[in-house]
UniProtKB/Swiss-Prot annotation:
Entry keywords, A to Z: Carbohydrate metabolism, Cell wall biogenesis/degradation, Cellulose degradation, Glycoprotein, Glycosidase, Hydrolase, Membrane, Polysaccharide degradation, Signal-anchor, Transmembrane, Transmembrane helix
Gene3D superfamilies registered for this protein in UniProt: 1.50.10.10
Phylogenetic classification of the source organism: Eukaryota, Viridiplantae, Streptophyta, Embryophyta, Tracheophyta
Segments of this protein annotated with the region Disordered: 1-26
InterPro entries membership: 6-hairpin_glycosidase_sf (IPR008928), 6hp_glycosidase-like_sf (IPR012341), Glyco_hydro_9 (IPR001701), Glyco_hydro_9_Asp/Glu_AS (IPR033126), Glyco_hydro_9_His_AS (IPR018221)
Gene Ontology terms: biological process: cell wall organization; cellulose catabolic process
Chain segments annotated as transmembrane: 72-92
Reaction equations catalysed: Endohydrolysis of (1->4)-beta-D-glucosidic linkages in cellulose, lichenin and cereal beta-D-glucans
Glycan-modified residues: N216, N314, N323, N344, N408, N425, N567
EC number of the protein: 3.2.1.4
Molecular function in Gene Ontology: cellulase activity
Name of this protein: Endoglucanase 10
């Protein structure tokens, strides 16, 4: 069939054009194309080894979603495996081969001093010493204490010697154990971080084990307590050897050591109760021992409340060396610790009774000694301790009023430590004169530093940035600055550039008033009077009394390194306990700083305030 296209082309229907149209249509049909591809793939699979299809199989790898050149595929897989093996090998080398880490920063001066301060307690141990005691010039001593006394006739071996002599005074010894325990309860993580936790706990147990021997600790009710072992009074004349009449190493003592008991001694009993109660919290994970301490503490506090009186009657050895001025502060102090150890509200009621606070001197704000924390006056420590209770538990009625009073009084005490208020004088070198210029000032200085540092940590833990002194607000850093300034003075930042901790720094006292340190450990026994030649010599002590805090400078920052003048050079157990507590509170380590908020409350039940009494009936 023919025709003419109006545009000049033929109108003939061509079969060739029809075929081309079919091809175009097939190109648009992808399903048909895929069917052809499937047939091709089947031919590859069915082809023999000599066929061209077999050659293609060797050259390509079909992954389903794509077809890859076999060489490229194998190279890629090999590379990935090689890189993986190399990385694994490197990681294994890094883990297995020891590599050097940057050394930790050197400990600060407070940590260094703390290690030494604890060693002083090792040097003061009485009785059979452990092999790891670490003081080469000390040995077993006074192994018959109590057994040779015709009245007591029981073992009083152990405990700590008080100072440069060999007397064991329970009153300052118990306070020292309370202070060490308090510092562990608040700063356990710090002790652990510097490797001293086991050491300080061992020292506390050494003290509390001895205190448990000094009364009938297995009874619920007692009628007497041992107050001290040994005698120091030489004022009565005569040639009766005792711990002050003689100058001997404790290991060589052969003179009688009398035991002094008391039958009405509320101050001593309550302080010993505080020591055992605080230690029971330290050892709460050792339930048997902790329970033993609590039982003893209950008996002691009960005895103190029932048998009223001071442990240091006029003219006694106790009154000469560690006179107690009152027992009311011990009732508050001991009651607070008994409450924390037992959770029994009866003890808290005693500690917070308004009459108790009044008798303890809580309202004697004009007293020159208000706020001076010592082995004799525990009120400032009790106020801080009970302020802690209010800050973190807020027990409410009926305790809130007196707790708020204690809290406000603690704020006032902290204000009194600041130089701008002139509550206490300061030496030109910067030492606060809490004992008003009298001798042996450092024991009071370190106690104040501890309370200030601890209270600042309490405020921080309670998210309280500071406190008010009248209309003026001060941050907690002001308290820490005060505490650091006092410890820095003790450690050498003073006009004499003298460290008052033996063995710390380049310049420290070489002639501590101490029998054991001053007499050579050379196998020679020097008798009662034979040792005095070592007391009088101007040579340095042959044995270094590591960590001992000496009595300190005078009010003009002057110091005499003279063995015979105990007002400058004698260390004491109580002073070193305050030093340890202050140092650990300011130690700067790379662990969680601040206090342990909760451990002290581990025995305290949840607080459900007692509702106030109903109002009286209305009458028209």
């Amino acid at each position: 069939m023919f025709g003419r296209d109006p545009w000049g082309g033929p109108l003939e229907i061509s079969n060739a054009d029809s075929a081309t149209d079919d091809d175009r249509s097939r190109d648009l049909d992808r399903g048909a194309l895929m069917r052809q591809l499937d047939e091709t793939q089947q031919s590859w699979l069915l082809a023999g080894p000599g066929d061209q299809a077999g050659k293609k199989k060797k050259k390509y790898v079909d992954l389903g979603c794509m077809v890859l050149d076999r060489k490229i595929f194998m190279w890629t897989v090999g590379t990935i495996l090689g890189v993986g093996l190399f990385i694994g090998f490197v990681m294994m080398i890094v883990k297995l081969v020891p590599h050097k880490r940057p050394p930790p920063p050197p400990p600060d001066q407070y940590t260094q001093a703390l290690h030494k301060a604890l060693m002083f307690f090792n040097a003061q141990r009485s009785g059979p010493l452990p092999k790891h005691n670490g003081v080469s010039w000390r040995g077993n001593s006074c192994m018959k204490d109590g057994l040779s006394d015709s009245t007591v006739r029981k073992s009083l071996v152990g405990g700590f010697y008080d100072a440069g002599d060999a007397i064991k005074f329970n009153y300052p010894m118990a306070w020292s154990m309370t202070m060490l325990s308090w510092s562990v309860i608040e700063y356990k993580a710090k002790y652990e971080a510097i490797g001293e936790l086991d050491h300080v706990k061992e020292l506390i147990k050494w003290g509390t084990d001895y205190l448990l021997k000094t009364f009938n600790s297995s009874a619920d009710t007692i009628d007497r307590i041992v107050a001290q072992v040994g005698v120091g009074d030489t004022s009565k004349g005569g040639a009766q050897p005792n711990d002050h009449y003689c100058w001997m190493r404790p290991e060589d003592i052969d003179y009688p050591r009398p035991v002094t008991e008391c039958h009405s001694c509320s101050d001593l009993a309550s302080e010993m109760a505080a020591a055992l109660a605080a230690a029971s919290i330290v050892f709460k994970d050792s339930k048997t021992y902790s329970d033993k301490l609590v039982r003893g503490a209950k008996a002691l506090y009960k005895f103190g409340r029932l048998q009223r009186g001071r442990y240091s009657p006029n003219g006694s050895d106790q009154a000469i060396f560690y006179n107690s001025t009152s027992y009311w502060d011990e009732f508050v102090w001991g009651g607070a610790w008994m409450y924390f150890a037992t959770g029994n509200n009866t003890y808290l009621s005693v500690a917070t009774a308004p009459g108790m606070a009044k008798h303890a001197g809580a309202y004697w704000l004009d007293s020159p000694n208000y706020g001076v924390f010592t082995w004799d006056d525990k009120l400032p420590g009790a106020q801080v301790l009970l302020s802690r209770l209010r800050l973190f538990l807020s027990p409410g009625y009926p305790y809130e009023e007196i707790l708020r009073t204690f809290h406000n009084q603690t704020d006032n005490v902290m204000c009194s430590y600041l130089p701008m208020y002139n509550s206490f004088n300061f030496t030109k070198g910067g030492m606060i004169q809490l004992n008003h210029g009298r001798p042996q000032p450092l024991q009071y200085v370190v106690n104040a530093a501890f309370l200030a540092s601890l209270y600042s940590d309490y405020l921080d833990a309670a998210d309280t940035p500071g406190w008010y002194c009248g209309p003026t607000f001060y941050t907690t850093e002001v308290l820490r600055k005060f505490a650091r300034s006092q410890l820095d003075y003790v450690l050498g930042k003073n006009p004499l550039k003298m460290s008052y901790v033996v063995g710390f720094g380049n310049k420290y006292p070489k002639r501590a008033h101490h029998r054991g340190a001053s007499i050579p450990h050379n196998g020679v026994k020097y008798g009662c009077k034979g040792g005095f030649k070592w007391r009088e010599t101007k040579k340095p002590n042959p044995n270094i009394l590591i960590g001992a805090l000496v009595a300190g400078p005078d009010r003009h920052d002057g110091f005499k390194d003279v063995r015979t003048n105990y007002n400058y050079t004698e260390p004491t157990l109580a002073a070193n306990a305050g030093l340890v507590a202050a140092l650990i509170s300011l130690t700067n380590i790379h662990v969680k700083s601040g206090i342990d908020k909760n451990t002290i409350f581990s025995a305290v039940p949840p607080m459900f305030p007692t509702p106030p009494p109903p109002p009286s009936a209305w009458k028209p």
